[in-house]
Amino acid sequence: DIEMENTHSLDLIQMGVIPDDTVMNQLEGTVRAVILSHGHLDHIGAVPKLVHRYNAPIIGTPYTIELVKQQIEGEKKFGVNNKLIALKCGQRYNISNTLGMEFVRTQHSIIDTATVALYTPKGAIVYALDFKLDRNPVLGEPPDFAKLKKIGKEGVLCLITESTNVNKKGRCPSEQIAKNMVRDVITSYEDDKNAIIVSTFASHIARVKTIAECAHEIGRKPLLLGRSMERYCVTAEQMKMVRFPDTTSVFGNRRVVERTLRRLIKSGKEQYVPIVTGHQGEPGSILTRIAQNDTPYKIERGDKVMISAQLIPNDMNRAQRYRMFTMLKSQGARIFDELHVSGHAYCEDHYEMVHLLNPQFIISAHGGIDLTSEYLGLATELGYTLNKDFFLMANGQRQKLA
């Protein structure tokens, strides 16, 4: 573990925690803007450490910019004074005399996600990281298909697209599917006297909303516990982007969380549904500490533990989650995992995106070569040729398009 706020950017670059932007020194021209497609940490986490080097505004959707503000306020090493521009989807912004941009509404596992359209004299460059084409979202509106089609007709020079789930057949299931899965499990225990505790991504506001509403439906009070739950959910509610049931309470500070868990045990676990972090088995997270008996909240035989999140596939997460599940099961917990749908486009979603935009060139991104190369099969099927109009690139590589 490292303390991001107190660590120098060059040290973080060396550790591989944040991007190595020294490659920018080799490029001609000036950085005119830093554009953020959404508020997940792998997209905004490096902002406080890097953007002070550039005399450029930071542009994002309103929720993303609010999260960036919080990131910057927590920065201890650098003073970040870049202008922050909150741009709603559908609004156009002129970066320079020859460059314009627009956010196009899409869906992902965090609210206020956008696909970026950068307008150049040679055509649009569309940055689609990350996205899914959910026509029936739980929160927010469906993707702006009309705008994507319009951009395609006007001419797209290049599509830079995520590749995370391009190897999965069909279309990515709607968030409504996850809502039904979660509701099916929670409501089936309406008369149960055992505890129900749920863990999900704190940034997945639509999912947290679903869990809170299902808890309220069976007469239990939703409790959002942990600093990240507080940060993401309170911010969204203050911005009127979500409304949780009136019975919902939020506690972020660790000592307050401990007191809340102690009070919960005294008044009866069957009256509440704690919604917590820790679905990956992360050390120090609330669910992991509960599994280790490090909190006042004790698991008893028959208690229900729901995991509304997918395992992020790496060896450390697998080992940590296995250890956590083993401890929970040894205490008698009933575990329901994988109550989840992805926030990343599947193969047929990518197929639709390419047909909407009809780009001259495609660059697959977001993942190692094992993921980005999966896009090659689809690109070939669509008439693109490797190293001619479809490119597999590594960080720091350059490709001339026009």
Language model features with spans:
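His/Asp/Glu-rich metal-coordinating catalytic cores
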Residues: 1-33, 40-260, 289-292, 319
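Hard-cation-handling environments
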Residues: 171-308, 313-334, 339, 349, ...
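Conserved donor sugar-nucleotide recognition element shared by glycan-biosynthetic enzymes
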Residues: 346
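Proline-aspartate-enriched helix->loop->beta-strand connector
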Residues: 56, 156-157, 350-367
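Residues that line or immediately flank small-molecule/substrate-binding pockets and catalytic motifs
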Residues: 38, 163, 366, 394
